[in-house]
A protein has these predicted regions:
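Left-handed beta-helix
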Residues: 15, 20-21, 26-27, 32-33, ...
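Extreme N-terminal tail/first-helix region
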Residues: 1-15
């Protein structure tokens, strides 16, 4: 796993997390307890903060990023992010499934107990 500080910010994570060998986590990122970050995932808090709750599963090839000076990214508790999804500058509440290959864009808000179908594109609310 590649862990990289940027602008004095270093990723932090809680207890009992799994990180695949080639996952990349950069900058102002905080990950809760009991999370799994799978192969080829990139979580890049280089331009704004990223906060990930407890019991979150981010599957292979996913990208989580934020929007420069505008939107941080927040992922709640008990969230599953499917393979190759893109989460960018948005808020995802608790108990959400983001389907494989989905894109959740800047300023979108996904409410609790929501399922996003595979391949969906969610734009700003």
């Amino acid at each position: 796993m590649l862990i990289k500080s940027i602008l004095g910010k270093r990723p932090l994570w809680g207890k009992d997390c799994f990180f695949a060998d080639n996952a990349t986590i950069i900058g102002d990122v905080a990950i809760g307890d009991f999370c799994s970050i799978w192969f080829n995932t990139v979580i890049r808090g280089d331009v704004n903060k990223i906060r990930i709750g407890n019991n979150v599963n981010i599957q292979d090839g996913s990208v989580i990023h934020a929007t420069y000076k505008k939107s941080s990214t927040s992922v709640g508790n008990y969230v599953s992010v499917g393979h190759n999804a893109i989460i960018h500058g948005c808020t995802i509440d608790d108990f959400v499934l983001i389907g494989m290959g989905s894109i959740v864009m800047d300023n979108a808000k996904i409410s609790s107990n929501t399922i996003i179908a595979a391949g969906s594109v969610i734009l700003e609310n």
